[in-house]
Amino acid sequence: MTGGKSGGKASGSKNAQSRSSKAGLAFPVGRVHRLLRKGNYAQRVGAGAPVYLAAVLEYLAAEILELAGNAARDNKKTRIIPRHLQLAIRNDEELNKLLGHVTIAQGGVLPNIHQNLLPKKTPKSGKGPSQEL
């Protein structure tokens, strides 16, 4: 018996690489896989399902954070707060449809004034053609 840390693996084996890094993702594929197994969504979970779900979650997070960052910059802030998330989601048609039933704590509401409540515009009399005969 030889002493060492090989543990029965081939001597030329590569270093361990996470499934997230193999897929080029920042979201944890292993954790998503564990949550899919423990959540009783199905008896069995395929190998590609957690990778795909982690990629979708990462894309959604990136999309929302980009729009929220733009909202924060428009308000001359450097930190994203729940209000910026609310503005980002409600001003985007597809995200609003996806997250329409979601309540964001401390998000506030969108600024909106009904047309009937706005002051009436009065026609200006002046340089128009004369109505006299």
Swiss-Prot record:
Pfam families cross-referenced by the UniProt entry: Histone, Histone_H2A_C
Chain positions found as N6-acetyllysine: K5, K9
N5-methylglutamine: modified positions: Q106
Site (Not ubiquitinated): K120
CDD domains, sorted: HFD_H2A
Region (Disordered): 1-24
Phosphoserine PTM sites in chain numbering: S130
Predominant location category: nucleus
Superkingdom per UniProt: Eukaryota
Keyword entries, A-Z: Acetylation, Chromosome, DNA damage, DNA repair, DNA-binding, Methylation, Nucleosome core, Nucleus, Phosphoprotein
Swiss-Prot/TrEMBL GO biological process terms: DNA repair; heterochromatin formation
Compositional bias (Gly residues): 1-10
InterPro entries: Histone-fold (IPR009072), Histone_H2A (IPR002119), Histone_H2A/H2B/H3 (IPR007125), Histone_H2A_C (IPR032454), Histone_H2A_CS (IPR032458)
Motif placement: [ST]-Q motif: 130-131
PTM annotation: Phosphorylated to form H2AS128ph (gamma-H2A) in response to DNA double-strand breaks (DSBs) generated by exogenous genotoxic agents and by stalled replication forks. Phosphorylation is dependent on the DNA damage checkpoint kinases mec1/ATR and tel1/ATM, spreads on either side of a detected DSB site and may mark the surrounding chromatin for recruitment of proteins required for DNA damage signaling and repair. Gamma-H2A is removed from the DNA prior to the strand invasion-primer extension step of the repair process and subsequently dephosphorylated.
Localisation per UniProt entry: Nucleus; Chromosome
Description of its domains: The [ST]-Q motif constitutes a recognition sequence for kinases from the PI3/PI4-kinase family.
Miscellaneous comment as given in the Swiss-Prot or TrEMBL entry: In contrast to vertebrates and insects, its C-terminus is not monoubiquitinated.
Job of this protein: Core component of nucleosome which plays a central role in DNA double strand break (DSB) repair. Nucleosomes wrap and compact DNA into chromatin, limiting DNA accessibility to the cellular machineries which require DNA as a template. Histones thereby play a central role in transcription regulation, DNA repair, DNA replication and chromosomal stability. DNA accessibility is regulated via a complex set of post-translational modifications of histones, also called histone code, and nucleosome remodeling.
Similarity remark: Belongs to the histone H2A family.
Quaternary organization: The nucleosome is a histone octamer containing two molecules each of H2A, H2B, H3 and H4 assembled in one H3-H4 heterotetramer and two H2A-H2B heterodimers. The octamer wraps approximately 147 bp of DNA.
Protein name as it appears in the record: Histone H2A
Organism: Aspergillus fumigatus (strain ATCC MYA-4609 / CBS 101355 / FGSC A1100 / Af293)
